[in-house]
Amino acid sequence: EEEDYILKSPMRRIHKIRAEKLVKNVITDEDIERLRDGCDCLRDVAMIDLLYSTGIRVGELVRLNRADINFSERECVVFGKGDKERRVYFDAKSKIHLINYLKSRIDDNPALFVSLDKPYNRLKISGVEIRLRQLGRKLHLDRVHPHKFRRSMATRAIDKGMPIEQVQKILGHSQIDTTMQYAIVNQNNVKAAHRKYIS
């Protein structure tokens, strides 16, 4: 049986259903303070701060080694999707908490984040997810998970006026459309911007 190419797509007249874009919750500055205060170990404080200030993926976080951290420049090299290397930056608070955590370590594992008990293995993605979920429940915070930190960092950066191309570079997105999903800013920010620039 012969096979031919279809000249016209049968799907061309079918319109995409418009789904309402939901503004997903982000972690507020107040939530971050509560999460920090709720931590009972230095590792978790350092982990939360690094996730919040860099916007890295949880898979990138657990792959980090001590040697990847440049404290003087407050930056680290991560390997994203498809093993693409990129540089990300962390704030002064993260630097202090990371230094305190590393000073407290008694193991020689090259991994940046390890389990709290012997044999001090490299922390796994599931370990980070479970820890954050437990912390969120303890503090009655709604659905605390690693990606929420990434979304919060991106939303914060966009809200404060960081150009979308720079946010794209920090997040390691190959397509700007992916980054644009974080640009669904809340209405109060739109109103404030209108007052600042238009009114």
What are these model-derived regions, one by one?
Residues E1-S199:
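Conserved catalytic core of the tyrosine transesterase superfamily
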